[in-house]
Amino acid sequence: MAHHPEVQHAIAEMVMEMEAIAPQLDTVAEDWSNGVDHGHAWVIKLVGAKYRAVEGAWKVVDAALDVTGGSGIFKKSPIERLWRDARLGKIHPGNYALSHEFVAKVALGIDPDEPPRWG
């Protein structure tokens, strides 16, 4: 299987996706550990890092399931657990809508905690 061009393409996509996640997480973690004051921009940095990591993990695990086929859905497969974890990360607070709402409000100078949240 490793010599099949489609499998190689899928593996390359997975590797590049994972490589893109780490630098953002490392930067946010380092800034947090060093007490860097990003003010309200912390919302963008923290929510953005979580969102990108979860979306990237989902893409990688979904592609891995495509490559492995049906055997990846069984409990004995480590891909099954990774698939479940990655999928649940997408709905764990904050989900897609909430993440986008908070990031956009902060970027637009709107206090995300100020009522009303919508309207």
Task: Label each residue range with its predicted role.
Residues 1-18:
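Glycine-rich beta->alpha junctions and the first turn(s) of the following alpha-helix
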Residues 12-16, 44-49, 118-119:
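A ubiquitous short alpha-helical element
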Residues 14-25, 50-60, 86, 90-93:
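Alpha-helical transition-metal enzyme core signature, strongest for iron centers
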Residues 19-51, 65-73:
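C-terminal helix-coil-helix/basic helical segment that borders enzyme active sites and/or dimer interfaces
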Residues 60-66, 97-101:
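Short segments within alpha-helical structural elements
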Residues 71-119:
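Glycine-rich phosphate/cofactor-binding loops in nucleotide/flavin-utilizing enzymes
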